From Swiss-Prot:
Pfam families: Ppx-GppA, Ppx-GppA_III
Family per similarity comment: Belongs to the GppA/Ppx family. GppA subfamily.
Catalytic activity: guanosine 3'-diphosphate 5'-triphosphate + H2O = guanosine 3',5'-bis(diphosphate) + phosphate + H(+)
Source organism of this protein record: Photorhabdus laumondii subsp. laumondii (strain DSM 15139 / CIP 105565 / TT01)
Organism superkingdom: Bacteria
GO biological process terms held by the UniProt record: guanosine pentaphosphate catabolic process; guanosine tetraphosphate biosynthetic process; nucleobase-containing small molecule interconversion
Protein's name in the database: Guanosine-5'-triphosphate,3'-diphosphate pyrophosphatase
Keywords linked to the UniProt accession: Hydrolase
One Gene Ontology MF term: guanosine-5'-triphosphate,3'-diphosphate diphosphatase activity
InterPro entries tied to this protein: ATPase_NBD (IPR043129), GppA/Ppx_hydrolase (IPR050273), Guo-5TP_3DP_PyrP (IPR023709), Ppx_GppA_C (IPR048950), Ppx_GppA_N (IPR003695), PyroPPase_GppA_Ppx (IPR030673)
The protein's Enzyme Commission number: 3.6.1.40
Known function: Catalyzes the conversion of pppGpp to ppGpp. Guanosine pentaphosphate (pppGpp) is a cytoplasmic signaling molecule which together with ppGpp controls the 'stringent response', an adaptive process that allows bacteria to respond to amino acid starvation, resulting in the coordinated regulation of numerous cellular activities.
Pathway given in the UniProt record: Purine metabolism; ppGpp biosynthesis; ppGpp from GTP: step 2/2
């Protein structure tokens, strides 16, 4: 029986949507039990005097009546409910908050923009991998939070009065997707950003992380259209032109854009374009969590680990009882291969990290069965929660593990967008070879081999006589040559000349 003392809930009364996150604490980490979202569009109910309409408040209260059933099983001390931008500015927010507290039978706290920014940063820091020095961007319905920080500590907190709902009402209220409307929306966003942009740029960052529905929508579009996962200004401009071609909000159709997100997508896109331009952002990735995760981790009082991905991989190894020594052996061998070909094959630090990850969990499929273990591994990685990895990175890991041995499914590489196709395939080739050479599960049988590449032609040079001394692996390598050649990947095997 599930103990209620291990359950936690966080509710975010946003300007566009209300969200509820229910989790269970498991061995010092968070297991998600439910994510519930309702589109309330509270900000759209504000009049010129900043008073919420009765209809907007009723939409919100009805949503909370639905949420309240789930809260009955959770200790009140383990529930946090916060309200953000719209209820910060609404003149009659007390009326809404008072009734909301009665419905939920727990306090509702209207938090400041700075507190919201801090919680968003904490949620990102607990759930998103990559470099420690980061810029976090969250575009809400009525406010946008921009935060810089290093590790667990936020250094610059900003909350601006612009959001996808308020910009929709202000600059796309005629429902026309024109150059003029986008220009007005972007200009207004630039004006809002001009005071804080220099301060944020001064702080600097190594990675930019987006934590909003707009960024989630962009990821869904890019996956559907076969782009890689990095959000860049040229991609944003291209999507803007596609939106303008549609003419009207009601006719907005972009491959990968859901109907639910379509209404506020153009306004959120205009704000994001202005942010990229004002802050000179090169690229952005999707965050693993934000405000609600920040609230939950605050209740759990867990430290922020420097390397979230390492924690995730360690938990998987423990949960599925993987052979850690063998995983390390394969990883070290793959790294040795990577060092030899990284420059000509243009494999950067991002490739290095993802190859390491694949090596450390490559045997997870054995926890189901030896037969079709690579397919089992891909299935597990596709559906397990992997804090620190983006959805695109999860898909790449699943693709690598699916193709770690046996026939190569070239089509599957087109289904991932974490890396360019050619880089993903090159990582796969190195992983497959590392697994073959390490399959004796002993360090003293690993050869001192050399790799050389010319375009996609890969040549392996082994010590003289090694193939004759290791006939089973020699046979496996001959089979591997056939598999890779069948995929149009040239693989040549040779030995050093006998020393005289």
């Amino acid at each position: 029986m599930l103990s209620s003392s291990s359950l936690y809930a966080a509710i975010d009364l946003g300007s566009n949507s209300f969200h509820m996150l229910v989790v269970r604490e498991v061995s010092g980490s968070m297991q998600i039990l439910a994510r519930i979202k309702r589109k309330v569009r509270l900000a759209a109910g504000l009049d010129k005097n900043n008073r919420l309409s009765q209809q907007a408040m009723e939409r919100g209260w009805q949503c909370l009546r639905i949420f309240s059933e789930r809260l009955q099983d959770i200790p009140p001390s383990q529930i946090r409910v916060v309200a953000t931008a719209t209820l910060r500015i609404a003149e009659n927010s007390d009326e809404f908050v008072g009734k909301a507290s009665e419905i939920l039978d727990c306090p509702v706290k209207v938090i400041s923009g700075e507190d919201e920014a801090r919680l968003i940063y904490q949620g990102v820091a607990h759930t998103t991998g990559g470099p420690e020095k980061r810029l976090v961007v969250d575009i809400g319905g009525a406010s946008t939070e921009l935060v810089t920080g290093n590790g667990a500590k936020a250094s610059q907190l900003s909350s601006l009065s612009m959001g996808c709902v308020t910009w929709l009402e202000g600059y796309f209220n005629d429902r026309s997707l024109t150059e003029e409307n986008f220009a007005r929306a972007e200009a207004a966003a630039h004006e809002t950003l001009k005071l804080i942009a220099p301060k944020l740029i001064e702080q600097g960052w190594q990675i930019c992380v987006g934590a909003s529905g707009t960024v989630q929508a962009l990821q869904e579009i890019m996956i559907a259209q076969g782009m890689d996962e990095l959000i860049t200004l040229p991609k944003l401009q291209e999507l803007k032109h596609k939106a303008i071609e549609c003419g009207k909000l009601e006719e907005l159709e972009i491959e990968g854009l859901t109907l639910e997100r379509a209404l506020v997508f153009p306004s959120g896109l205009a704000i994001l374009i202005a942010i990229f331009q004002a802050l000179n952002i090169e690229s952005m990735i999707l965050a693993g969590g934000a405000l609600r995760e920040g609230l939950v981790y605050g209740m759990l009082d867990l430290p922020i680990e420097p390397d979230i991905r390492t924690r995730t991989l360690r938990n998987i190894q423990r949960r599925f009882q993987l052979d850690v020594e063998q995983s390390q052996r394969v990883k070290q061998l793959a790294e040795h291969f990577l060092q030899q070909v990284a420059k000509p094959w243009e494999l950067d630090s991002r490739c290095h990290e993802l190859l390491q990850s694949a090596c450390l969990i490559h045997e997870i499929g054995l926890s189901i069965d030896f037969h079709q273990a690579p397919s089992h591994a891909a299935y597990l990685i596709n559906y397990l929660a992997l804090p620190g990895y983006t959805p695109a990175q999860k898909k790449l890991l699943a693709t690598l593990l699916k193709n770690q041995s046996g026939p190569i499914d070239l089509f599957s590489f087109n289904q991932q967008n974490a890396l360019p196709l050619i880089q993903a395939q090159r990582l796969c080739r190195l992983l497959r070879l590392a697994i073959i050479f390490a399959n004796r599960r002993r360090n003293d049988t690993l050869p001192a081999l050399r790799l050389k590449v010319s375009d996609e032609a890969l040549t392996i040079t082994l010590p003289h006589g090694w193939l004759m001394q290791h006939p089973l692996r020699a046979e496996s390598l001959q089979q591997e040559i056939q598999w890779q050649n069948h995929a149009q990947w040239s693989l040549v095997l040779g030995e050093q000349d006998a020393q005289t």
